[in-house]
């Protein structure tokens, strides 16, 4: 039996509730979700579903089937993208010469190879979110939230992390919306100050894609086109969704042990695992 992570509503760096996921038989060209010891997260990058595990970065290539991306089996914890570049944090693979933790590493070939960017041997981000040249990372060792305005080259601490998710504006540097105690907080200066966005909904996950916001509340997916002031329900699930991840081509939502994707901005979803 395999474990799939789900975000908890508790405040902290990043807290996972564990859900059982059934495995299937191995194929000749891929492993299964059941073959890895621990899954940290699931994200979409372009039209691919990537699985972050203790044994490396994998692509979901079939129903419960995964294929290792590249050869380096990093223990991938935090993970995000800025344009075509992938950014990750976590721990080196067994036998690697990389320091532990690996700090922030970057890939410009889709995860086939990685190069150090910053904080090598110092920081283990269990949470990474970014857009444009802005990156936010929550360090599991100190519990602090860090911010970079130059794609992770330099960082400043914002103090103890109190957010469960952050959606970073792709259009304005320093602008982001965070979830704290299920409420939305807007910043235009990288959390030097925040303004609460008044809303009756209680949110668990939020993503910013182009000029639209997408968020999970209860068992439904919502969309906002006015920076979170008003929301329109676009999909409802049988169960409480856990993970929300969005690219220009694909949207992903997990419900319990199931993974769903949408190719029409969340209007309809297909179960893929």
Model-derived features with residue positions:
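Residue position within the beta-strands of beta-propeller blades
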Residues: 51, 88-89, 137, 178, ...
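Short coil/turn segments that connect the beta-strands within blades of beta-propeller domains
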Residues: 46-47, 83-84, 132-133, 172-174, ...
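Short, solvent-exposed loop/turn segments at conserved positions within beta-propeller repeat blades
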Residues: 35, 95-101, 138-141, 178-179, ...
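Asp-box/BNR beta-propeller loop motif
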Residues: 56-68, 73, 100-118, 146-158, ...
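Short loop/turn segments immediately following the C-termini of beta-strands
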Residues: 54, 91-93, 140-141, 181, ...
């Amino acid at each position: 039996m395999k474990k799939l992570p789900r975000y908890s509503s508790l405040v902290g760096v990043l807290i996972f509730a564990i859900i059982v996921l059934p495995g299937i038989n191995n194929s000749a060209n891929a492993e299964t979700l059941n073959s890895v010891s621990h899954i940290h997260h699931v994200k979409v990058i372009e039209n691919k579903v990537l699985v972050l595990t203790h044994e490396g970065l994998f692509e979901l290539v079939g129903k419960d089937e995964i294929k290792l991306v590249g050869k380096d089996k990093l223990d991938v914890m935090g993970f995000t993208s800025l344009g075509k570049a992938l950014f990750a944090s976590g721990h080196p693979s067994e036998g690697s010469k990389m320091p532990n933790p690996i700090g922030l590493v970057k890939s410009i070939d889709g995860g086939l190879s990685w190069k150090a960017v910053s904080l090598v041997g110092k920081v283990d981000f269990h949470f990474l979110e970014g857009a444009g040249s802005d990156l936010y990372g929550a360090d599991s060792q100190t519990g602090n939230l860090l911010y970079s305005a130059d794609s992770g080259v330099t960082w400043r601490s914002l103090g103890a992390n109190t957010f469960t998710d952050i959606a970073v504006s792709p259009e304005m540097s320093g602008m982001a919306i965070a979830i704290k105690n299920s409420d939305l907080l807007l910043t235009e200066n990288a959390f030097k100050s925040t303004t609460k966005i008044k809303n009756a909904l209680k949110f668990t996950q939020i993503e910013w894609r182009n000029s639209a916001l997408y968020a999970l509340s209860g068992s439904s997916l919502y969309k906002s086109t006015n920076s979170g002031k008003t929301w329109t329900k676009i999909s409802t699930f049988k169960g409480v969704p856990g993970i929300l991840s969005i690219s220009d081509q694909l949207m992903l939502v997990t419900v319990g042990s199931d993974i769903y994707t949408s190719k029409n901005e969340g209007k309809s979803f297909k179960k893929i695992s």
